[in-house]
Amino acid sequence: MRRILIATSNPGKLRDFAGAAAPHGIEIAGIPNFASLLPVVEDGLTFEENARKKAEEYSRHAPGEVVVADDSGLEVDALNGAPGVHSARYAVDQPHLANENTDDEANNARVLRELRKIPPEKRTGRFVCVLAAARDGQILATFRGTAEGVILDSPRGINGFGYDPLFCFPQIQKTFAELTAEEKARYSHRGAAFRQFLEWCEGLA
């Protein structure tokens, strides 16, 4: 069984990856002693920049292993693409707090506050996920997945994390927080990016 290391301490992201990888016989694991490593400052202007930066750095701590780093977030059209790369810390969004994530409830509250006068038909947006795969400090490939949806005016669902309770996927009229792990792997931005990664893995030495 092939093992892939994921450069995150976010249990929600690890669950998402594990759910997508399980049907392919791939083991998902975190980087050993990840919590003791110095965090990589996520100061890139794009998801791609942040994902590549994290993959390069964290892969140096797992010699010979393929390490995948994820940078993802929510882009709301009515907010000119915000929260974007600031999704995890949107409630504070100060440059000197580049690695200080705020809690999901506070981030969701800010999005709802900023959309309070926006009509439903203009509350469109998307989740974006960029994965970067690296080994021994060298980028091997990057993958981008998106999921288009609508931002609700109140949260729904108890699964997931982040902005999942606000993000309604029109094709099935459920928020990402109402999906099973299997459904989320099928429909989500992270699932889309990870499927590209799995296809690439088939030719990996």
Place the predicted regions along the sequence by residue:
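Anionic-ligand binding patches
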Residues: 2-5, 11-205
